Amino acid sequence: MIITIFGPPGSGKGTQSSLLIAKYNLKLISVGDLLRNIISSSSELGKKIKGTVESGNLIQDEIICGLLRDQLALVDDNCLLDGFPRNLNQAHFLTQVLQEKYNRDVDIVVELQLDDNIAIDRLKNRLACLDCKNIYSVSSFKSTTCAKCKSTRLEKRIDDADMSAINKRISEYHLQMKGLREYYKGKLLTIDANLSVDEVTQEIESKISCNLV
């Protein structure tokens, strides 16, 4: 089974992806994690990507698609793609690569739909563990140690630090989603991401079960 999950910033893609790969025994390919790892390497590419991310702009398709192709070469056709594709061009690329490698396309597309104001509030308060990638809200999580892996490396993401960049990312997401919804019509599961984590998980699993019948 090949699943892709996307949604606006703050919609809980990473959280739901972690739960889904455990539930369905899938390999995870997270574009966001790949980019953050490159940024932390301080390479020339990392510096270039960091500048793009901090301004709220999208990374060039050529870079994203190259990273994805490399990752797909390492997994079989039981995987979940977190945050990819982000536009119609990337969707066409993904179809081409999957057809070449597995003679198939994506099976299920999960879209997490989130109110913009809630997204902004979540991003302003988001705190991430640099080691296990667990996410917390600074308004409710007061510890300096990650509850999951006990790391003390808790930080705000660089792309959450600037309000104008946040607004730009959300606007760009809505703009790109129009074409993606049409492209994946028939495979698209729309989920209310304004709900609690458990409620969102239940809705996703219920709709996936119905889709697999």
From Swiss-Prot:
Residues 30-59 are annotated as: NMP. One of its GO terms (biological process) is AMP salvage. InterPro entries: Adenyl_kin_sub, Adenylat/UMP-CMP_kin, Adenylat_kinase_CS, P-loop_NTPase. HAMAP family: Adenylate_kinase_Adk (MF_00235). ATP binds at residues 10-15, 126, 135-136, 195. Keywords: ATP-binding, Cytoplasm, Kinase, Metal-binding, Nucleotide biosynthesis, Nucleotide-binding, Transferase, Zinc. Monomer. Zn(2+) binds at residues 129, 132, 146, 149. Disulfide bonds: none annotated. Pathway: Purine metabolism; AMP biosynthesis via salvage pathway; AMP from ADP: step 1/1. Its EC number is 2.7.4.3. It holds the Pfam family ADK. Catalyzes the reversible transfer of the terminal phosphate group between ATP and AMP. Plays an important role in cellular energy homeostasis and in adenine nucleotide metabolism. AMP binds at residues 36, 57-59, 83-86, 90, 157, 169. This is Adenylate kinase. It comes from Wolbachia pipientis wMel.
